[in-house]
A protein has these predicted regions:
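Receiver (REC) domain active-site loop signature in two-component systems and cognate sites
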Residues: 57
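C-terminal output helix
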Residues: 106-115
Length: 120
């Protein structure tokens, strides 16, 4: 299985990768995108099983990438790991088809709890 990690912070992508490994998902193919547009393009080209996205990124936000993917008929499991969390953001994410919304800081246990049902 393939997991796409989209975040404009290289350090945060590394932290998400490390936490995925700690949660037992290290055997998955982990690929990275540095902004929302790249996440959109890579999702269409690489066909990941899961997209873990930051909310605020240059070029295109994570929410804009999700909306654009859904409009194009792509139903990849997509959700957010972000430091910002408001009820409005969560409602927008759910309305766009987000599978999860994880608030930073996060733990390997939280990743396991959220991603095990998604990845099987």
């Amino acid at each position: 299985m393939k997991i796409l990690i989209a975040d404009d912070s290289r350090v945060m992508r590394q932290i998400v990768t490390r936490t995925l490994r700690q949660a037992g998902f290290g055997d998955h193919d982990l690929v990275e995108a540095a902004d929302g547009q790249q996440a959109f393009d890579m999702t269409n080209a690489e066909h990941p099983d899961l997209v873990i996205s930051d909310w605020n990124m240059p070029e295109m936000t994570g929410l804009e990438a999700l909306v654009k993917l859904r409009a194009a008929g792509n139903d990849v499991k997509f959700g957010f790991v972000t430091s910002e969390c408001t009820p409005e953001m969560q409602a927008q994410a759910e309305a766009a088809g987000s599978a999860f919304f994880i608030v930073k800081p996060f733990t390997a246990e939280r990743f396991d709890e959220v991603f095990s049902p998604i990845l099987g």
